[in-house]
Amino acid sequence: MSHIAVIDIGKTNAKLALVNSVGLHEIAVITQPNHVVDSPPWPHFDLAGIWVFIQNGLAQFQKQYGIDAISVTTHGASIVLIGQNGEAFPMLDYEYSAVNSLSDNYAQLRADFSQTGSPHLPNGLNIGAQLHWMLTTDPMIRKHLASIVTYPQYWGYLLTGERASDFTSLGCHSDLWNPYARDFATTLDALGLRSCFAPVRRPDEILGEVKPALAQKL
């Protein structure tokens, strides 16, 4: 019987669960509150704090039980921009109402519902609206942007070094995915970001192995 560590990041709580491969029964669970940091450049999630929690929890599970695989799930409506230095830009809180200030302008850029199946939602619930607002608010982001990954795959990137996007995350009212063509929607072309997105992978694919240095630490 093998052990699977599940990283489960919700908006209000971050959770690590160790489950067995037979029946997926929980063996151990660790949680900590997740909160929005209300400071410049905009309200954002504490990615660094969550990463410390993840590393400590994985190390504890590995020491007590052993880990054979890691799976990641997160809340939706979030995206991570990675700079040329390999570090993440602050990840915008998708409930930030200031995004609505550019709603009319964004409406001219977003792909039609018939292409994406995404309704036009308030605040940053459409990831495309988040991207438009951030790039308009801070144009310098484009100069330093290296790649964009979906939120679950950000944690996979920290674990493995591999950058990827997942079409199930993109397909969740993001305005960025055309499920009929199984390709990015024209919203990304309007935003000039198609080339920035990490390659799309299936959610059941193995992203990679944990980086050797990190594996030794854990």
Regions found by a protein language model. Give the residues of each.
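A charged helix-plus-loop insertion that forms the helical arch/lid used to bind
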Residues: 85-99, 171-173
